[in-house]
């Protein structure tokens, strides 16, 4: 039986997937029920679905970090959220994740994009906080 979350080896380009600026994929402490989820809840983020991304997860002690992976079969499960005030919410989350507008590239994480595979077979391009 095929895993309903299978992530195919595919390069995402602007022509193959378009970023939905209101979607955010989370895989760690921003998930529902975990330590930093209150930031999403306070900003009115709406849970969309469980999803998977082609990445590898690393145990950083108190929290995980995910990096893009070109290895077939490497996937990280997380949650997809719709942000109702994306610009403001992402500014808050950038601070939470240690991303500084004054010193970009100096924190543990960077905001980027990722293709998310959903259980219904759909694929969405969303924001993610990648581990450097």
Predicted regions: what they are:
Residues 2-132:
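Glycine-aromatic micro-motifs
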């Amino acid at each position: 039986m095929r895993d309903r979350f299978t992530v195919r080896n595919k390069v995402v380009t602007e022509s193959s997937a378009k970023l939905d600026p209101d979607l955010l994929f989370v895989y760690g402490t921003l998930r529902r029920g975990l330590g930093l989820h209150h930031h999403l809840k306070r900003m009115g983020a709406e849970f969309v679905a469980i999803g998977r991304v082609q990445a590898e997860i690393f145990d950083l002690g108190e929290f995980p970090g995910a990096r893009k992976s070109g290895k077939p079969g490497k996937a990280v499960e997380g949650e997809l959220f719709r942000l109702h005030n994306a610009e403001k919410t992402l500014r808050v989350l950038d601070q939470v994740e240690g991303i500084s507008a004054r010193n970009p590239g100096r924190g543990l994480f960077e905001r980027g994009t990722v293709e998310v595979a959903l259980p219904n077979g759909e694929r969405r391009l969303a924001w993610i906080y990648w581990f450097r």
